[in-house]
Regions:
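GST-like domain detector, emphasizing the conserved glutathione-binding G-site
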Residues: 6, 15-151
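Tryptophan-centric aromatic hotspots in well-structured domains and transmembrane helices
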Residues: 40, 91, 110, 159, ...
Length: 242
């Protein structure tokens, strides 16, 4: 178990401090699967890290005999991610995000403005429930070399919808910054694993889409996650072989 209090102004990213004071309590505990392969774990993790909300991480490797038993200690679904705040347990990425928005209103988890928040929540829910073809064809692998694969019409349809959604959010709400709603928010956290999929599977995208992807991949929190993923000893051959 490791504590995170990220000073995201520091560089290089592999020196981001883990609980540098050594004695301050960290109230939140985020339970994750392998960083190399878990898209759902990244979503709350990058939100917590980028918004500088202190937390501890507990990694329970996937595809191990003890995986489900370990995850059941923290969530009744036996899946990751889940969040512990003292005696309060929260599971599922969107539920964790909404809990953080309520617990840390000063952190602007969702965009400011009623219309922007409604749009951001809609996009986050669409991501949570949709884009099945892309997710099945291009499984998450944060240390995969950049290499193209054949894509079906269904996958290309998912990509087209994602590009349109990002472009509309940027044009309507994102003029104040590099992210979907200007400042980094939960909507960006929900789509962060998609950025990785489009990048490592070398999917052809517009210049505008690529600029947004580069903004996400330039985040210190993103770089810290990728560094951790590459350092993990665990391998899942069925994903690495794609």
């Amino acid at each position: 178990m490791r504590a995170w209090r990220l000073d995201l102004a520091l560089a290089p990213t592999d020196q981001l401090p883990r609980n540098p004071s050594g004695n301050e309590p960290v109230p939140l505990k985020l339970i994750l699967a392998k960083k190399a392969y878990s898209s759902w774990s990244l979503r709350p993790w990058i939100l917590l890290a980028q918004l500088k909300i202190p937390f501890e991480e507990v990694i329970i490797p996937m595809d191990q005999p003890e995986t489900r038993a370990g995850m059941l200690k923290y969530a009744p679904t036996g899946k990751c991610p889940s969040l512990q705040d003292g005696k309060i347990a929260i599971w599922e990425s969107l539920a964790i995000i909404e809990y953080l928005a309520e617990a840390y209103p000063e952190k602007t988890v969702w965009p400011k403005g009623k219309a922007a928040r409604a749009h951001a929540r809609s996009l986050a829910s669409e991501m949570h429930a949709g884009f099945v073809a892309l997710r099945q064809t291009c499984p998450t692998n944060f240390r995969r070399p950049v290499k193209a694969i054949a894509l079906s019409d269904e996958v290309r349809g998912d990509v087209a919808r994602i590009e349109a959604a990002w472009a509309h959010a940027r044009a309507t709400f994102g003029r104040g910054g590099a992210f979907l709603f200007g400042r980094f928010s939960a909507a960006d956290a929900m789509f962060a694993p998609v950025v990785n999929r489009l990048h490592v599977y070398d999917v052809s995208v517009s210049t505008q889409t690529r600029a947004y992807m580069e903004a996400i991949m330039a985040l210190p929190a993103w770089k810290a996650w990728i560094a951790d993923a590459r350092a993990e000893p665990w391998r899942i051959e069925r994903y690495d072989a794609i």
